[in-house]
Amino acid sequence: MKVWLCLGAVVLLAALATTTVTGQRGGAFRESRDHPAIRYSDGPRHDAVTALDRAVQAGEVALVFEPTSGYLRSVLEALDVPVESQLTVFSETSFQAHRINPENPRAIYFNDTVAVGWVRGGDVLEVASLDPTQGVLFFSIDQQPTDRPQIRRNDQCLACHLSWDTLGVPGLLTFSTLPMPDDPNAYAVGWVTDHRSPLQERWGSWYVTGAPPSVRHLGNTTEPIEYVPGASTDPTPALDTLEGLFDLRGYPTPYSDLVALLVLEHRTHMTNLLVRMGWETRVADYEAARAGRPPADQAAAIR
């Protein structure tokens, strides 16, 4: 991370100040993720999830399958992801959307470099892992009992996790989504949030525990909301626990904590920013080498 910050600052600041003649939205990486300097699809990987898969296939680590949660607890333990980070969201914003609802919310767990998504009854565990050079990689683990489950790359996730909202690099994002009415013709309404978003615009279709009643937000409401951007929102239920809202079997903890939500939203934008800085610098150094110029860090020192 420190290397990215040192090498990437000049390149990123220049890119942020530039508007392209093609009319592309600014502030995003514009090269291919498989640019020779990046090689996102086939470059070497050194992330925690890839290391775990190698250990599992070598028989050095055993992942234990449980009837309700599958490999969830075992994977969290192996990757040192705390169960206290659990967040629950019932918007259908996953490729396992057909299984997600207020009575069966998707659970998300995270640490500094890994995020794990679990849907009770789902076919796979969803895993995102921050590689020191490649950025955020996406994986899935089949929720079927076997001696050595494989952790496979899953670029299907890039349909949502590679966009302008992730700064043009494979990255992380959180949505605030208004609960859907019971109408098959209704359209989902939502927007990306991070640490810069007003609290009153955050957490639509998320359960939020531990928030004081004075904090206005869009969480804890499963009924359709008449929402006007910028307008004051009605108070939502203040929850101390998830108990009584839905069947908690399989969930390691009965919480979806406010503090964990705040940390995750800060992490998403910061992760994407650091990845983009790294990619911008590598492309700049690659092009400089082809042209016989010094790399970006040396050029900055010369100036």
Language-model-detected regions and their locations in the chain:
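Bacterial N-terminal signal peptides
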Residues: 7-17
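Sec/Tat signal peptide C-region and signal peptidase I cleavage site
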Residues: 19-23
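Positively charged n-region of N-terminal signal peptides that target proteins for export
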Residues: 1-4
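N-terminal alpha-helical interaction blocks
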Residues: 26-122
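Sequence context surrounding c-type heme c attachment/ligation sites in exported
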Residues: 24, 111, 117-303
